[in-house]
Amino acid sequence: MTIPFHKEIRIGGYLLKQKLLGRKRFPLVLMLEPLFRCNLACAGCGKIDYPDAILNRRMTVQECLDAADECGAPMVAIPGGEPLIHREIGEIVAGLVARKKFVSLCTNALLLEKKLHLFKPSPYLFFSVHLDGLREHHDKAVS
């Protein structure tokens, strides 16, 4: 998979700016987890072992956008849990895209067809679908 030219330019510009400012350490990707809850219980994922108080917590749209603003990274990965479970995931993504953040929404895709209407096509948004190998191995790993 190639990287779109506009993304190369934006990220390259960000890296150059950090270098010119003399910064040796700076964020490149914000790992934003608006929730830990998932619609699967994969054996390899430690999230299922968290107490319900954590699994039931949801970041608000404003908390997510504030975190992105504070971090300043040009890229935001939204893993989970399963982000498509979040009731406001469409607004979270729209707010990040409006800030010209490159958003990678990581999903197991079980809800993707049902939730796809929440997302407006954008060169700043892509979906990363999690698979654990070919069908037989994947189905065993996530069941």
Segments (PLM) and residue ranges:
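Conserved alpha-helical substructure of the radical SAM core
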Residues: T2-L118, S122-P123
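Broad gene-expression machinery/nucleic-acid interaction feature
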Residues: F126
